[in-house]
Amino acid sequence: VSFIFLIDYKMLKVEWSSITSNSFNNDSFYGDLSAILIQNLPFWIQLFRTPEISIALMDEWEEKIERMAIATMREDVTNISGVPSWTLVLLNKILNLSGKQNITEIWPNLELFIHGAVNFQPYKEQFRKLIPRTDMNYYETYNASEGFFGIQDRHGSDEMLLMLDYGIFYEFIPVAQLNR
């Protein structure tokens, strides 16, 4: 991958991210984990992501989607990550504002959607209609505020790899011993 490639393309994060300063301590904040992560990303990551932090951290969902659509449709997005239902709302908003028929008309280099939080199957056909590329890649993650548990690590397989070395304790109990 060349340096020019990294500068020219963007990753789009679609998430509900809200953060609030602590009224008792101006140096501490509380809010969604994704918002805290966004606010603490290294500066160089901001070069490769869209939308800008001020939009990503907006509280009001309708205004946020509108501003995200306007800001991101001018970028050359190659990958998207987010919850499928929220991402569909944004993609449809972008199509409505742009007058285009599908997302590949706006982002011809889009090739990857990393999704999680919900079952993707009910949304898959909608994504295929919005992004009619036979080479579009869809990968699932399984994470929560408590940690990152699994990732789909193989193309063409819905199986996920359990992340055993991420500082999470797992205890596996045989089904026969559950009621003991």
Residue ranges and their predicted role:
Residues V1-R180:
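Active-site phosphate/ATP/adenylate-binding loop shared across adenylate-forming ligases
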